[in-house]
């Protein structure tokens, strides 16, 4: 249980950093679920045009893995309007920027 608490804390901290240094024009929330993979992201638009994003994270991950997964999924959110969910060049550039701020190499 202590690992789960630490992982949730780390994920929140990483998301706070990312939304401050690489903001998107809509709210991003974290959600913990039973997943086969490590994480998933989704940007959705309501009928009124309001957008939001959700990063789903697998229950039971350690804090370091949570940090990596939040970075990976946040890069998808940054690149969403360009290519959707693909791991292409746009996503790669977004991931490099995200990782730079989280790893401290900026």
Predicted segments — roles?
Residues 1-68, 77-106:
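Active-site-proximal or metal-binding-adjacent scaffold patches in catalytic folds
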């Amino acid at each position: 249980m202590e690992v789960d608490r630490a992982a949730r804390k780390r994920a929140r901290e990483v998301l706070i950093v990312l939304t401050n240094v690489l903001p998107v024009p809509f709210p991003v929330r974290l959600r913990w679920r039973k997943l086969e993979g490590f994480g998933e992201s989704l940007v959705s638009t309501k009928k009124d045009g309001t957008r939001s994003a959700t990063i789903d994270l697998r229950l039971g991950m350690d804090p370091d893995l949570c940090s990596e997964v939040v970075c990976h999924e946040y890069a998808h959110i940054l690149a969403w309007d360009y290519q959707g969910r693909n791991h292409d060049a746009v996503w790669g550039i977004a991931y490099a920027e995200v990782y730079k701020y989280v790893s401290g190499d900026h």
